[in-house]
Amino acid sequence: MNKSLFKSGCLVRTAHVILTWIITLILFLHNTDLRRCQERGDLLQPLVFSSVLLLSVLLYFTVSLMDPGFVLSDSQTETASGDGDEELEAMIPQEQNSIKQRRCGYCFLLQPMRARHCKWCKRCVRRFDHHCPWIDNCVGELNHRWFLLYLCVQFTAVCWGLQSAWSGFISAPSWQQWFTQNVFLLVAFAVTAVFSVVLLLLLCIHAYLASVNCTTWEFMSRHRILYLKHVDSEENPFDRGVFCNLWSFCCVCGTVAWEKMYIRHNNASV
């Protein structure tokens, strides 16, 4: 990545950390459930909350900084051949047919099926889902499961923060006094409320996509994707049932030979 992208990534990640700790400080400095537990010496709830928050930050940086599944150059592909698809090949019968890979019009690399060039990362990404500006990274074949796990943990932390902010509001004789006394908690409540809605939507969407083995890009742009254009609109050549889809999504590490699955589906349909 070039320097401007690196700087923008640092800016986004710094903003995420600062916002996280500002909200946390507000919750612990006001008379919330977390603060009251701390004052009583009951440290279990504050410690669990802090642990969930720390885990969310660690997962954020994991998803943000890890390789989402960048397509290797031709020379790198030859070197790494035979290392990535062993687990999937044991699950999918070998087919004699083959699908010719196309070259990317931007970076001129051979694109595996379901890969797409990201204009922000300036690289092709395997099983491209989308480019997420909040993590300043693509969500692809290698980090999609971690992205979904991050959404789960972050949603838990945000909802907990929302409830804690609500518990800290204090009454006052007038609206002006109430606003003055609760302004910081009100900001924390508003921020966590917005983020909880966004995270819930993302969580539901990506859980559904994982269960049907589809990506955001395929779902939104099916009519533009060559390998899906001639497939019935209700068909998904990569769908092997909810259990197998979730097992593959969560437990199969490395890259997947999607071409073999696609050929198997086409042969079964004939």
From Swiss-Prot:
Protein topology in the membrane: Multi-pass membrane protein
Q: Give the UniProt record's GO annotations in the biological process aspect.
A: negative regulation of NLRP3 inflammasome complex assembly; peptidyl-L-cysteine S-palmitoylation; protein targeting to membrane
GO terms for MF: protein-cysteine S-palmitoyltransferase activity
User: What top-level class of enzyme does the UniProt entry assign?
Assistant: transferase
Q: Which ranges of this chain reside in the Lumenal compartment per its record?
A: 30-45, 167-182
Pfam families per record = DHHC
Enzyme nomenclature, EC number: 2.3.1.225
Q: Tell me what reaction this enzyme catalyses.
A: L-cysteinyl-[protein] + hexadecanoyl-CoA = S-hexadecanoyl-L-cysteinyl-[protein] + CoA
Principal location = Golgi
Instruction: Spell out the disulfide connections.
Output: none
Task: State what this protein does.
Answer: Palmitoyltransferase that catalyzes the addition of palmitate onto various protein substrates. Has a palmitoyltransferase activity toward gephyrin/GPHN, regulating its clustering at synapses and its function in gamma-aminobutyric acid receptor clustering. Acts as an inhibitor of the NLRP3 inflammasome by mediating palmitoylation of NLRP3, thereby promoting NLRP3 degradation by the chaperone-mediated autophagy (CMA) process.
Its protein name is: Palmitoyltransferase ZDHHC12-A
